[in-house]
């Protein structure tokens, strides 16, 4: 695939100069849904499919983007002087958002780029194609400008920062972290409250994880994602009036049941219950996987898939 992206780049922008290629994977979350913005645990892993990029630095501040996935859009032209927060209107919002984020974090992007992208992540499938674009852009910028002090965790945080502030999606850290820190044959057991993590080998003897497509398109920006997060934040504020906690992820199931009546709205109570119970399921699922108890791991995954429908009114994608 890399060669096809390079061939496309040469056809559009010429094959001369320092053209560099990059790749960032997609991700799937095995368990831990709607917990990352509630200070809980998640258990994602990177995929072999992802986003390929060919890029060449320019001498001016012009930006030229082309996606092999959106051929009808043609070459999208912009510049480093034309950041339009929340108003880009197409896929270039993600690489431009990362360029903006680098600038905001003290790492100037002072030269433009010619960029060709191709992703073999199905768009809107819930496998984090947008976070993959953000991450591959961050890796490219770090390399092109020699910003060696930027770590992969920094790139994940910059991706979340750009998603929150440039694209207006109040996402947690899971997608970008899983993509930036993914490791072959492992999932990442991540505590989103402090970013402590460990790699857990995924060795399923006699079993296989299958990612299936429901044919329901999903995009964080046009889903109920921001609304669900706001509901959880309000529920947390209500609980904090009776219990000293910083996030819903700190609560056990028993502790939640003891304080749940502090949440005045029954819908918000459902949202918070899911966050707390799902966090506990995630911890239990990782323990089951480590013990090679695949049946228990599967039971917890099934419960994880049911809970968002019952308590957050969201469907699997």
Set out the residue ranges of the language-model regions:
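ATP-binding N-lobe of GHMP and related small-molecule kinases
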Residues: 1-127, 131, 135-152, 161, ...
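Surface-exposed charge patches
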Residues: 100, 157, 287
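C-terminal nucleotide
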Residues: 1-27, 52-88, 186-315
């Amino acid at each position: 695939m890399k060669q096809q992206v390079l061939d496309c780049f040469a056809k559009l922008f010429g094959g001369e100069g320092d053209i560099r290629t990059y790749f960032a994977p997609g991700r799937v979350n095995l368990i831990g849904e709607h917990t990352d913005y509630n200070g809980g645990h998640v258990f994602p892993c990177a995929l072999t499919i992802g986003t390929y990029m060919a890029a060449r630095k320019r001498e001016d501040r012009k930006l030229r983007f082309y996606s092999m996935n959106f051929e009808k859009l043609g070459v999208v032209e912009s510049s480093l002087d034309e950041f339009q927060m929340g108003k880009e209107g197409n896929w270039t919002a993600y690489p431009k958002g990362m360029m903006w984020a680098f600038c905001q974090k003290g790492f100037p992007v002072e030269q433009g780029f010619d960029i060709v992208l191709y992703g073999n992540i199905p768009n809107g499938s819930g496998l984090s194609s947008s976070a993959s674009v953000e991450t591959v852009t961050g890796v490219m910028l770090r390399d092109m400008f020699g910003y060696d002090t930027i770590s992969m965790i920094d790139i994940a945080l910059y991706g979340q920062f750009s998603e929150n502030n440039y694209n207006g999606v109040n996402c947690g850290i899971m997608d970008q972290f899983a993509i930036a820190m993914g490791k072959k044959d492992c999932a990442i057991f991540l505590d989103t409250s402090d970013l402590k993590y460990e790699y857990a080998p995924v060795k399923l003897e006699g079993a296989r994880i299958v990612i299936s497509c429901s044919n329901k398109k999903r995009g964080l920006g046009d889903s109920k994602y921001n609304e669900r997060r706001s509901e959880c934040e309000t529920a947390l504020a209500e609980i904090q009036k009776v219990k000293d906690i910083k996030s819903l992820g700190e609560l056990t199931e028993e502790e939640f049941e003891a304080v749940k009546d502090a949440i005045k709205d029954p819908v918000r109570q459902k949202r918070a219950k899911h966050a707390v119970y799902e966090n506990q399921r995630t911890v239990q699922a990782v323990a089951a996987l480590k013990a090679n108890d695949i049946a228990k791991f599967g039971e917890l995954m099934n419960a994880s898939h049911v809970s968002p429908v019952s308590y957050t009114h969201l469907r699997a994608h």
